[in-house]
Amino acid sequence: MTFGWKLYGDGKTPPLGEAVAPDERLSWPRTVGIGAQHVVAMFGATFVFPLIMGLDANLAIMMSGVATIIFLLIVKNRVPSYLGTSAAFVGGVAAIRANGGDSSDVVGAILIAGVVLALVGVLIHFAGLGMINKVLPPAVTGAVVMLIGFNLAPVAAKTYWPQDQWVALATMTFVIVASLALRGFLARIAILLGLVFGYLLSVLLDATAGPITSVLGGATEATEHDRISFDTVGDADWIGTPDFTAPSFSVKFSLLVIPAVIALVAENVGHVKAVAEMTKRDLDPMMGRAVMADGVGTVIASAVGGSPTTTYAENIGVMAATRVYSTAAYYVAAIVAILLGLCPKFGALINIVPGGVLGGITVVLYGMIGLLGAKIWKENRVDFANPINLVPLAAGIIIGIGDVTLTFSDDFSLNGIALGSIVAVVAWHLARALAPADMKAALLREGTHPASGSTLGHGSDAPDPSSVDEVGRPGVTDGRTPGTGAHSR
């Protein structure tokens, strides 16, 4: 591994059809500019999901920078990626809080899941990806991703939406229109733009229509309140550290978030393959390292109260649009994120996002997460005419979405995402073992890549990053192999 990035040509924007490789860079001013684009790309989801999970958004942004640097070091600067907040844990976190857990319980459970993810990465590194494909075929992976997303429907419907239904409706509508009407990079940040729109709309309504009467999150009775209050912003310091939270550990709560590991493995593998396709480099030897690095990043972030991390499709999209794959730009983005995390006033501004705005955003995001499970099925040609796929996965999905509970004792039970995921995995393998030979043979015609195209919970409205050219038009994949341009050494 080296930090001595080679200067690409004269350090200016690469010509049409050429690209800047991971071990190259443009001039430092241009590299800083590319890094700024990566900050904007990751920003929306990186602070929206901590807010939804009840964690400190400022700390999440800061630790995303730390996790990104750790990731780049572990993969030896060969896999350019940014680690932002993962959406895969939102359902498990909601279940923890519904069962009386607090933020310490949440980050403790996430830390355990991070350890499991890191161990899976080690297993992939030494045993190969084939073992994971056997345990978690696309049919099962898609089912787990789907139940994670759709299990969250009551959170959006009962917690956020009722706080301000009209702002929620307006925000949701804006996100839908923006994702369709805008093009290129702006379409990829439709969620962030929707949040800004809802934020400003709430300020305008407070000024013109006055306070609103509704039930705030966690309350049982309706009260009159402003949609947004800037008191905490005025009281916050300009420079300081975020609020840290020490983790506490519980087997019950850990089991609620461990199913997210399945989604993260699929997501990481899919993203590494997308980067490999764009850079025209063989990154299969880095697959295990990338998964392990994501796990390590999650462990370190959650150890101080931060959010879980994952590689971001939005940032892969920025690389596809600019054809600048330099890891130097990611170090710049990570440093900027760390500095933003050290500004409490910035964090206070984030933490006062109105509940109605989150209501409009979450109905879109949670639905997108669930439908990405169907995307995995489609891209891997999963055959639901085959009872091996249809029957066990149907049971697992309904158990997960319906929040069915299996009680073992007064102190221990499984429900929702955890129980649904276990049923989906175990019942599928049991059905496969008991099925006649012709049903087993039909499975061989399905795809074998559990992560094909999956981008869990963010960036899914963007085109496939591996088929976007330098100006963001989908479907153009030609161009020279990165690293073939002239260098100044």
Residue ranges and their predicted role:
Residues 9-10, 15, 43-46, 174-178, ...:
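Juxtamembrane interface elements at the cytosolic ends of transmembrane helices
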Residues 18-32, 49-72, 256-327:
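Membrane-embedded helical hairpins/re-entrant loop segments and their flanking transmembrane helices
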